[in-house]
Design a protein with these regions (language model features):
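PLP-dependent aminotransferase class I/II
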Residues: 17-24, 32-35, 96, 108-112, ...
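Phosphate-binding glycine-rich loop
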Residues: 6-13, 17-59, 73-77, 83-85
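PLP-dependent aminotransferase-like
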Residues: 50-130, 134-139
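Active-site PLP attachment segment
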Residues: 150-192, 217
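Structural detector of well-ordered beta-strand residues that form the stable sheet scaffold
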Residues: 36, 61, 82, 134-136, ...
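Conserved active-site segment immediately N-terminal to the catalytic lysine
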Residues: 137-166, 195, 202-207
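N-terminal "arm"/small-domain region of PLP-dependent enzymes with the aminotransferase-like
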Residues: 1-12, 205-207, 323
Length: 349
């Protein structure tokens, strides 16, 4: 198997030659100077925020409608998540909502590129920069989607169901050489020397805080093979999303969450009335629908930072994720759309 041959060249499962090659290939694909591979997007968000100086006494502006993995790094760093509402049509934050949420304690903005949709904060980027507020993009669902050009640390996920998979893993796109160096050090427990260098010496230096966050060569090998075929996967995902959108375009009561024309979609999410009932009917029929995600500001772990977010709370009762993966066909999407409409039309009781 090609992944196995790639991984074997490194001679070990930990980070090494193959991970470094994967980083260079990612940088070339994304057309950026450097990419720092990490063990997960959650680790990537943690390290990116840490690099920006997020810690006790600081706040991070973040949407509530996201996976808990976006929020936990903020809390782990001792900072405060300042939850904000999103646009009901995209489930992404907008510049004006970010601007209104800024306080003297704000150190970073963490937009979530929901479903693969880019979040454009260009209109406030200059204001944020002048206030020393950093942008860290949670692009866990957005590999392959266009980048907006705003100076941001961008974090990708290479989990098993993502557009690009390494089975597990992620990557951070740094803005500067200094950030790249800081990220590489902090992903290695704050140790300044590489593992290869350490086995040749009797000591090493721990320069600062860090996590065990390196991407293994085994996972990097999988990622390299998947990157080589990514354009094919991207086409399949766009075709599948468009098939859903076409099938549901004129359906009464259904709103398809828009990911934008150029995105590589991660999923297809709709808003429907009576979501819980529809969800149950479709699950009973064997259709793998889901909900992504319950709002974080209503979770017990984050209750101390809850705020009134009426849009988030309304859409949270309506969103439904339809089955979505590149092994599906457009026929599958049309069948699922028809099943959704049948479930919605079924009388209650």
């Amino acid at each position: 198997m090609l992944e196995e041959r790639h991984g074997a060249t490194a001679g070990r499962a930990s980070a090494g030659l193959v991970a470094a090659l994967f980083e260079r290939e990612l940088a070339s694909y994304l057309r950026v100077p450097d990419v720092v591979a990490v063990s997960s997007a959650t680790v990537g968000i943690h390290l990116a925020l840490q690099t920006c100086g997020v810690g006790p006494g600081t706040e991070v502006i973040v949407p509530s409608q996201t996976f808990a993995a976006t929020i936990q790094p903020i809390v782990a760093l001792g900072a405060v998540p300042r939850f904000i509402d999103h646009s009901p049509g995209t489930l992404c934050v907008e510049a004006e909502a970010v601007k209104e949420a800024i306080t003297p304690a704000t150190r970073a903005v963490l937009p979530v590129l929901y479903g693969g949709r880019p979040v454009d904060l260009t209109s406030i980027a200059s204001d944020l920069r002048h206030q020393n507020i950093h942008i860290v993009e949670d692009a866990a669902q957005a590999f392959g989607s266009p980048r907006t050009g705003v100076q941001a640390l961008t974090v990708y996920s290479f989990g098993p169901i993502k557009q690009l998979t390494a089975l597990v893993g992620g990557a951070v796109v740094p803005r500067t050489v200094e950030e790249a160096e800081a990220l590489r050090q902090s992903r290695s427990l704050g140790i300044t020397s590489s593992q290869t260098d350490r086995i040749r010496t009797t000591t090493y230096c721990v320069q600062g805080p860090g996590l065990r966050g390196v991407l293994s060569d085994v996972n990097a090998a999988v990622g390299r093979v998947q990157l080589a075929r990514f354009e094919t996967v991207a086409v399949l995902r766009r075709e599948l999303w468009n098939a859903y959108a076409q099938a549901l375009r004129d359906a009464p009561g259904v709103a398809v969450i828009d990911v934008g024309n150029d995105a590589v979609p991660f999923n297809c999410v709709v808003r429907v009335p009576g979501r819980n009932r529809v969800h149950g009917i479709m699950r009973d029929r064997g259709v793998g629908v889901g909900v992504h995600y319950p709002p974080n500001h209503l979770q017990p772990a984050f209750a101390r930072w809850t705020r009134s977010l009426p849009i988030t709370e309304r859409t949270a009762e309506e969103i439904l994720s339809l089955p979505f993966h590149p092994a599906m066909t457009c026929h599958d999407a049309r069948w699922t759309a028809a099943a959704l409409l049948e479930a919605m039309a079924r009388p209650p009781g």
